[in-house]
Amino acid sequence: MPYSIMLDAGHGGRDPGAVYKERKEKDDTLRLTLAVGEILEAHGLDVQYTRTTDVYESPYQKAMEANNAGVDFFVSIHRNSFPSDNAVSGVESLVYDKSGIKLKMAENINEQLEDIGFVNLGVKARPNLVVLKRTKMPAVLVEVGFINSDVDNKLFDENFEEIAQAIAYGILDTLESNHEVESPGYEVQVGAYRNERYAQNLLEELLEQDFPAYIVEGDRLYR
């Protein structure tokens, strides 16, 4: 069976993401995500999307959507932002922790984008990002340049097709070198609460101990 992947266009709908002049992150991410997906589909991957139009879903909804779909990988595409305009430029990728195939995929994507002309700012661990900590599968969040950097926006606009190819090839190169999808291992339920706050407190304790924990809501319980 082919690998399956869920692509997430960051933000959307009432959430524009970062905004610079007339430019909105949600528009750049949707256009780029669809272009990346088209390339991956042409290479035989089973591609699913959190959104294909300008609609809003919370990060939690996106993570649960990926989990329910049972995909092998999750890649979220964003544009970065900095408090001062034109102060920083470059690409970086975020992962839950710097280990496993997700780290390799993040590094491959960054290197492909660096070849186009972006500054490679590396891979950073962000264990508190919802789409990284609540997805069951290896997940990467890619920041494709700073939206308030004229240098990065010029690269984005003038090399759009190459950027889509770079992200797609970074993913494909990773999969080609890893014929086996990382085993999800065994999952253990450690609690069931009617009060979401109690479940959230336990979640934070588990995450602090480096367990890849997440909350499942159903039957009026938080597990």
PLM regions: where:
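Active-site-proximal helix/loop segments of hydrolytic enzymes
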Residues: 2-4, 23, 27-183
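A mature extracytoplasmic/lumenal domain signature
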Residues: 11, 51, 81, 146, ...
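Periplasmic OmpA-like peptidoglycan-binding domain that tethers envelope proteins to the cell wall
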Residues: 19-26, 196
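Acidic/polar low-complexity segments and flexible, solvent-exposed patches
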Residues: 122-125, 160, 173, 179-223
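A short acidic, helix-capping loop that chelates divalent metal ions and anchors anionic groups
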Residues: 15-18, 150-152, 223
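Short glycine-rich His-centered loop
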Residues: 3-22
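Short, flexible active-site loop motifs that bind/organize anionic cofactors or intermediates
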Residues: 19, 52, 188-189
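Short, polar loop/linker segments at the starts of domains and inter-domain junctions
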Residues: 20, 154-155, 201-206
